[in-house]
UniProtKB/Swiss-Prot annotation:
Keywords noted in UniProt: Lipid-binding
Role played: May bind long-chain fatty acids, such as palmitate, and may play a role in lipid transport or fatty acid metabolism.
Binding site for hexadecanoate: T62, S94
The keyword Chloroplast belongs to this UniProt entry's keyword annotation: no
PROSITE patterns in alphabetical order: DEGV (PS51482)
Lineage, uppermost ranks: Bacteria, Bacillati, Bacillota, Clostridia, Eubacteriales
Highest rank taxon of the organism: Bacteria
Domain DegV: 4-277
The protein's name: DegV domain-containing protein CA_C0701
Length: 279
């Protein structure tokens, strides 16, 4: 039986117990704030980062995983006899995928495959979880690679943002539009589309925001064989509604805390759902 190692980056935002359970190798991105650099999740979590951002009124930057770190990781597992499936955040949002490709080319090994998820946070997470499930089922290296690539267009998402301040600071939303949105109580519903964050809807109030996200997770559209991920950035309003809906529909789901890279843009009080649709 093939030894297969699943590798990803820290933007997958999977809980530590899941990472340990499936022995996933997670390479953290760097978070740069106040002249210091931290490994995402390892050295700093979102709650700590959020506190710094609020108190200092600053916005952090992030750095991709370097080719050398991928090279060291791949070389280690190849030496141990593994074949490696590396699934990374969207190439349109970070150079991390390209770093992994450079590392693969340096090693000149056919036993390493690098996949662009065209997603981020729990959208990347659901693909990593599927790869782990397929491995547990005894699927081959080639079968897992092909199934993950086939699944990528079928990952769906909806994220509700309570405040727009961090989107403004991060340049994802104009200052004028964001300020007006905050004043009017407008909630942005975003989705990951074609590898980038896109506005799905604009509504006023938490109830309408919850309704838009709920419409995305209708029972008939979701593949219940796959695990749905419920992403939380300290949200106490919409998240319980989404959780209850998934329980009622008997969906398998895992709750995940947002990491620093995505959380820097979402801010607190955001939440979202990521799943694989039927196809």
């Amino acid at each position: 039986m093939e030894k297969i190692k699943i590798v990803t980056d820290s933007t997958c935002d999977l809980p530590e117990y899941i990472i340990s359970k499936f022995d996933i190798e997670v390479l953290p991105l760097m978070v740069n704030v106040k002249g210091k650099s931290y490994f995402d999740i390892v050295d700093i979590n979102f709650k700590q980062l959020s506190k710094i951002m609020d108190e200092e009124n600053i916005f952090p930057t992030t750095s991709q995983v370097t080719p050398k770190r991928f090279n060291d990781c791949f070389a280690k597992y190849l030496k141990e006899g593994y074949k490696i499936i590396c699934i990374n955040m969207s190439s349109k949002m970070s150079g991390t995928y390209q770093s992994a490709c450079i590392a693969k080319d340096m090693l000149e090994s056919e036993d390493v495959v690098v996949i662009d998820s065209l997603n981020v946070t729990s959208g990347l997470g659901v693909l990593v979880l599927k790869a782990c499930r397929l491995r547990e089922e005894g699927k081959s290296f080639e079968e897992i690679k092909n199934e993950i690539i086939e699944t990528i267009p079928h990952v769906k998402s909806a994220l509700a943002f309570e405040r727009l301040d961090n989107l403004i600071k991060g340049g994802r939303l104009s200052k004028t539009a964001g300020t007006i949105g905050n004043l009017l109580g407008i909630k942005l519903i975003l989705e990951v589309k074609d590898g980038e964050m896109a506005i799905k809807d604009k509504v006023r109030g938490n109830k309408k925001a919850a309704r838009v996200v709920l419409d995305c997770i209708k029972d008939e559209s979701m593949n219940k064989e796959e695990t749905t991920l419920l992403l939380n950035a300290e949200n106490d309003d919409i998240l319980p509604i989404l959780r209850q809906k998934l329980i009622e529909q008997e969906n398998k789901f895992i709750e995940c805390e947002v990491g620093c890279v995505v959380g820097a843009h979402s801010g607190t009080k955001a939440c979202g759902v990521f799943f694989i649709e039927k196809y």
